[in-house]
Amino acid sequence: MEFWYTEQHTPDVRLSIRVNRQLYSGQSEFQRIDVFESPEFGRFLTLDGYMMLTEKDEFIYHEMITHVPMCVHPEAENILVIGGGDGGTVRELLRYPSIRHIDLVEIDEMVVDVCREYLPSTASCLSDERVHIHYEDGLRFVRKPIDTYDLIIVDSTDPFGPGEGLFTKEFYGNCFKALKEDGIMINQHESPFYEQDAYAMQRMHQRIVHSFPFSRVYQVHIPTYPSGHWLFGFSSKNRRPVEGVDFARWKALGIKTRYYNTQLHAAAFALPNYVEERLEDVEPQH
């Protein structure tokens, strides 16, 4: 008998992956956590039935959420990651010897424990001495620091459930205050393709552009996320993501990547017309 994992992307569209076995299933204080093993995508993690990462394609997400801002701000030393309990974003950050301190704020300790046991390819880095894990609500955590971080990465789940507070005006305003003058915020910006996802993306974008003087969006292809077409947000007080960036300096670091490169970095900010139109619909008119 075949065993399939199926996720509903819209009322009329589903993603299905054949599964060899289920490695873990548990209920934390916040959500249901499952880990499966599949022939095509290797091990994968779901939260409340929604795909978070697979061993086969997680490198795309984690490289693009990390190396884009680090290329723009190579002097970044003090980093805040909100969410990201699987460890993939932290793993990529730790490839930069210049980074001295990473605060990882994850609301659900069980996510970290499960990933450490079943997804060591992303989570084994969490024991690094530069990483400081805080098991608390990111919305609450970010109220405290002022002018503290060079980079904030909002590696959150979708805008419902435990991560819901990470999509509010209050949250983005506090991120702005927590950043240094030349700081950058990166957030996973949802998908522009299916109507329900696009609406969530627009609401988020509207709140960010009201909190930051400069905000751009870049795109990436992630096969196991709804539609495969995914966005990240790049927001800052004054830095630009392409103009004036010293790409040669990043290349000189010799960091070996599987998805990210400096040509792709620049190209990712060129968006399809339908995405530009959805973003412009919620941006302030000048």
Locate each region found by the language model:
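Conserved Class I S-adenosyl-L-methionine
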Residues: 172-173, 198-219, 233
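Short, structured loop/turn "capping" segments at alpha-beta junctions
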Residues: 125, 185, 215-216
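The AdoMet/dcAdoMet-binding core of the Class I SAM-like
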Residues: 2-4, 53-182, 194-201, 224, ...
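SAM/dcSAM-binding transferase cores
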Residues: 1-34, 206, 227-286
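Conserved beta-strand signature within the Rossmann-like core of class I S-adenosyl-L-methionine
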Residues: 182-189
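Rossmann-like AdoMet
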Residues: 1-63, 67-69, 95
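Active-site proximal loops enriched in glycine and acidic residues that flank catalytic Cys/His/Asp
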Residues: 189, 219-221
